[in-house]
């Protein structure tokens, strides 16, 4: 093979499709289901990152700006090539002080401006009454109004599978439940392939490849240590927990973004397949397969949801229909 890709999540599947469509002979393996870890544990959004844009402006960070611009371009691409898995979603940002309305609108207007031709719809200001009409369960006390902007919503797991199948259609070979147990090297120490183990049968086989791509996300350090046992860790994993509530917690056609949670993060409240998704958290954690959502993180989400819903709406632990945790493969600060 020209390429052996380890990991069949969003990154691995994307690399496989890119390589296969360029005429390369590609093999891709994953020790679990395709997209079974981080890539299926998202907020179900394809977005440029409003909060990253805020950081770019406040910190004059050119790299953050470029990331937002690239993400907005990719958002439009997904909406164009896979309209059956993606769709525009208006998202309301409630404002509980009058001066926050122009502040939020300035940010979303810039977001639209950067998107340019890739924009899905123009942001607009809504009055207090219109905000409550759109989101009846929203806390009305001190509500001044709000701003609505547009982002994309996506079925992450099905998109991952679509990328894998598209890569296979263009000649790639893909196998799930197939684990890399060792990297094979030449006499000169160059990686020339890997030993694979079938997780179902235990059989092992050696695969030769001109290049090996480590696309294992938060698990990448384990693969790196197969090459260099003394390699220092480069991943600082963070847990992102989401919960789902019954569908009546949010309107069908609009999401909500709380830009100022108790600890300064943001939280989304989004309609999803007849239910409502709320999340996410951002907590340092250890790397482990199939992480379980912590009760403390679930309670944090419940508390934040209670903060921006009407006081006559009782949010109980028993309202949680499901919860999941995904690991963000954040890069360690080298300093």
Where do the language-model regions lie?
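Flavin (FAD/FMN) cofactor-binding and adjacent substrate-gating region
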Residues: 93-170, 175, 185-190, 273
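Dinucleotide-binding Rossmann-like beta1-alpha1 core, especially the glycine-rich loop
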Residues: 44-134, 267
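Glycine-rich FAD pyrophosphate-binding loop
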Residues: 20-42
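Core beta-strand elements of the Rossmann-like FAD/NAD(P) dinucleotide-binding domain
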Residues: 1, 200-211
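N-terminal Rossmann-like FAD-binding beta1-loop-alpha1 element of flavoenzymes
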Residues: 2-28
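Short, hydrophobic/aromatic-rich segments at coil-to-beta transitions
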Residues: 190-194, 253
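Conserved SAM/SAH-binding loop
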Residues: 177-181, 199-200
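Active-site substrate-recognition segment that forms the wall
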Residues: 18, 29, 50, 84-87, ...
